[in-house]
Amino acid sequence: MGLLVSRVLRCRDSSLLEPQPEAIAGASYIPGSRKRKRNSLEELATSSNVHGPQNQGMYPHQVLNYIYWKRVKISSNDAYQNLFLDGHDSDIKIRALGRTWCLHKVFLCQSGYFANILKGTWRESHHGVINLIIKNEDIDTRSLHFVFGALYTDADLSITPLEVPQVLAAACLLRVDRVIQQCEGIMKETINRNTVCSYYLAAETYRLKAVKTRCFEWLLCNLMVHPSVALYKEVDLKLMYLLALSSDLLVMQKEIDVYTTLKIWMFLYLNPCWNGTMKQLLQHANNWLSTHMAYVDNISFLESEEGLIFQPVFKKLRFQHIICDLTSTTILEQDRLIPMAWLSPIYKQQWLTLLRTQEYGVIGPQVINEQELEECTMRCGTMIPKDGRYTWKWSVGRLGFPLRVTFTRQCVILRQRCQRCDGSACHNHIRNVIFRITLVCFDSNKRVTFRKTTGYKILTFEYKEEQIVMKLDSDVLTFPMCIFCNFLFVNLGNAENK
């Protein structure tokens, strides 16, 4: 109990440690009698058991003085059991949420909240009882009990990950830094699909910046790579808005798949009682949307009363990378989810950009604009199931040029494909592209075990040219592995849709 005693002694204050008059029994206390107090403490020194029957009338400050003067260590288990759980020698009661705790001022003063309450004129107007009115619904009796108990022991008390947000809320209310730090450590180590959203909300509420950042990074990596019905049900509107906005979102396949993810998330948001598998989810979402829109004329779903709250999230889709192929455009039109007022300016913008590219021989972006990269790059990705050589292309429409990606255990290669795109912007033999390649490996718990990125770079390609854009150490690679790319072929913003 050495650390516990030192913590309590450091926060001792005469206004906290003096027994309250209403708690004193008659003649056993004589104000100002130092001789009597000194004699009683000398009598205590003859006993080796501070919790023995002869000492049941001791006040907590006497217990601490005894420990301090005699250099006797009492285990924190004894303090936790005898003083906290059994309530021996309690000099104050805390009432909250329908429960009463018999506690001790010398331990409560470790809480910044109670240290302030117990000062000044409090003891003049109360009778050894503090009534807490708690309006925070995250705090319950279990979390309060945990935080009170932590004041009586040096050891970290056991807590499950799912209980952490409630304990953190109680610790922040009572201002117990040690418990806040314990919660922060547990949260950092136990982020998974069952905890990530509750941790994120708690970290945002109670300003744990490092935890909030880790949770957001976990979601960026796993939202589309490891989709889950349970996870999607937990993501709220604000959080999904931030995820859809980010260029760091690890997108599986293409931008149309971000749209699909938002569609099934919206379905679950509006139908929280739906139970099924990820394989069933898209079909159910499509059927639900089709049935709903059968009774709606002239407007899209996002323009309906139910859909209005989702508009900010869907506006962050990069439609210029969705309408670049017929299949994706057909999906948008059939769903009638997106307002035509959003899409018409994008069609116009794409067409004018294509004409300018062909007319003036634009070779592509020549400077890196951070804001444009964050808002406008094409996001795409795929899974590498096992070791080997893989080659594929992502459709980039007529504003890009035919780019082929090759992955081997030694490197990643980008190449301008051999065939020309008649009538497209790729008639120029020399073209620029801004790109970023990111490789990620996960363990069985969906945690990132390996990550490597090129950062954003500009490459100039001549016709049929190939370039190695990332070299790899084959010894550190594990499979399956995910490869993600961000591309910007022209300086094309989403200005009409912001």
UniProtKB/Swiss-Prot annotation:
GO cellular component, one term: nuclear matrix
Pfam families linked to this entry: BTB (PF00651)
Principal localisation: nucleus
Chain segments annotated as transmembrane: none
Superkingdom of origin: Eukaryota
Residue ranges annotated as motif Nuclear localization signal: 33-39
Compartments where located: Nucleus matrix
SUPFAM superfamilies assigned: POZ domain (SSF54695)
Pathway the protein takes part in: Protein modification; protein ubiquitination
Domain BTB: 90-160
GO terms of biological process kind: germ cell development; protein ubiquitination; spermatogenesis
InterPro entries on file: BTB/POZ_dom, Gcl-like, SKP1/BTB/POZ_sf
GTP-binding recorded as keyword: no
Keywords: Developmental protein, Differentiation, Nucleus, Spermatogenesis, Ubl conjugation pathway
Assembly behavior: Interacts with CUL3.
Cited function: Possible function in spermatogenesis. Probable substrate-specific adapter of an E3 ubiquitin-protein ligase complex which mediates the ubiquitination and subsequent proteasomal degradation of target proteins.
Protein name: Germ cell-less protein-like 2
Species per Swiss-Prot/TrEMBL record: Mus musculus (Mouse)
Gene (UniProt): Gmcl2
